[in-house]
UniProtKB/Swiss-Prot annotation:
Keywords: Ribonucleoprotein, Ribosomal protein, RNA-binding, rRNA-binding. GO terms for molecular function: rRNA binding; structural constituent of ribosome. One of its GO terms (cellular component) is ribonucleoprotein complex. Belongs to the universal ribosomal protein uL24 family. Part of the 50S ribosomal subunit. One of two assembly initiator proteins, it binds directly to the 5'-end of the 23S rRNA, where it nucleates assembly of the 50S subunit. One of the proteins that surrounds the polypeptide exit tunnel on the outside of the subunit. The keyword Ribonucleoprotein applies. The gene is rplX. HAMAP family: Ribosomal_uL24_B. The keyword RNA-binding applies. This is Large ribosomal subunit protein uL24.
Length: 105
């Protein structure tokens, strides 16, 4: 089964406090039929950690997951939000941007 959003994709946030921010997908989480993505520089919170053996404590920034419905892939040609389609080229199933028709991978 092919996924519409994969790690390493450039995306834009459509809704929420980080609306219109652009980032790269770090991780895709699929749990209990809910899909979420972790995006670099988006939905950042501060985590306070205690010192442990081998590492000091402190306050660190951490990216939290966002629901897949709140993000869209950036079109490689026009840099606008786009939907993703699938087509078969030379016997391989590839993703393409519906706005420009460019192949994503």
């Amino acid at each position: 089964m092919s996924a519409k959003i994969k790690s390493g994709d450039d995306i834009i946030v459509l809704t929420g406090k980080d609306k219109k921010k652009i980032g790269k997908v770090i991780k895709v989480i699929i749990r209990n039929a809910k899909k979420k993505v972790v995006v670099s520089g988006v939905n950042v919170c501060k985590r306070h950690t205690k010192p442990r053996a081998g590492s000091g404590g402190g306050i660190f920034n951490k990216e939290l997951a966002i629901d897949v419905s709140n993000v869209a892939i950036l079109d490689p040609k026009y840099k606008t939000p786009t939907k993703v389609g699938f087509k078969i080229i030379d016997g391989r199933k590839v993703r393409f941007a519906k706005v420009s028709g460019e192949v994503i991978d």
